[in-house]
Amino acid sequence: MGIPSVEYMKSTPLILAAGAIFGAIYGTNALLPDIYDNPTSEVQAGSARIPGLSCAEEDGSTTAEPRWDCDGTQIRAKKVGVQDKDQATRRYLRAMGEGTAMPEGDIDRDGDKRTLSDGDLVAISIEGDGPTSFLSLRGPRAEELAQEVEKA
């Protein structure tokens, strides 16, 4: 191989310095908390809420259509003016699900609250003074959290 050239030897400290700088940046990034964590907020939309439950807002969450991730259970909300509350609850469940068929099953009614379940997906509508508030819950705690939804 031979003796390294002088030019090669001059660039070695620069390469080592660049490696040290990039290593320091990477190490600092790994040690510091992620400042881009999604904010946490109370699960409430329109006239529907789950008292005492605060979850991380999902990417794409807006004031008009908030979204939360509650330890693997996703919650979506929307306010819509509708005439037929039962039909609208079925349509909302279908829209949040993966199928195209209209969901069957009985809608549970409790005052202004309607609940329809299909596996790990639950749709809830709550009538308020204005538009009807809809919530969808999907995931391992969907049924449990659906029981906690109340009129705000």
Question: What positions do the PLM features span?
Answer:
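N-terminal targeting sequences that direct proteins away from the cytosol to non-cytosolic compartments
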Residues: 1-73, 138-152
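Conserved polar/disulfide-associated segments of primarily extracytoplasmic proteins
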Residues: 57-134, 138-145, 150-152
